Design a protein with these regions (language model features):
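A short, surface-exposed loop/turn module that caps and links secondary-structure elements
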Residues: 31-56
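Enriched for short, Lys/Arg-rich terminal
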Residues: 1-4, 12, 16, 23, ...
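Secondary-structure boundary motif
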Residues: 16-19, 34
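Short, well-structured alpha-helical segments
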Residues: 22, 26-30
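Flexible domain-boundary/linker segments
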Residues: 27, 42, 46-49, 63, ...
Length: 88
């Protein structure tokens, strides 16, 4: 089981998501906790690789950006639409 910590930024952005997306995100969060590399999450390391940032899909449009704190703990940094999230 993966432990998840969140930043204030993540919590703020999560609260701003449309209700239907928040519901999907909650389900994906649980799935991530059970298996962070489940195929439906499309977990990937972002470029540049040295930043150590990763993402997974909430749905086709929305993503969660995170960083590994250690082998069993992830820090969710932010979330939002694909078009916006990759500009950070």
């Amino acid at each position: 089981m993966i432990a998840v910590e969140t930043t204030f930024e993540f919590e703020r952005r999560f609260a701003e998501l449309p209700a239907a997306v928040r519901k999907q995100a909650h389900k994906k969060w649980i799935l991530f906790s059970e298996n962070p590399y489940h195929p439906s999450l499309h977990t990937e390391k972002l470029h540049p690789k040295q930043r150590e940032l990763w993402s997974f899909r909430i749905n086709r449009q929305y993503r969660i950006i995170f960083r590994w704190l250690d082998a069993s703990t992830a820090l969710f940094l932010t979330c939002g639409p694909h078009s916006w999230i990759y500009r950070i």
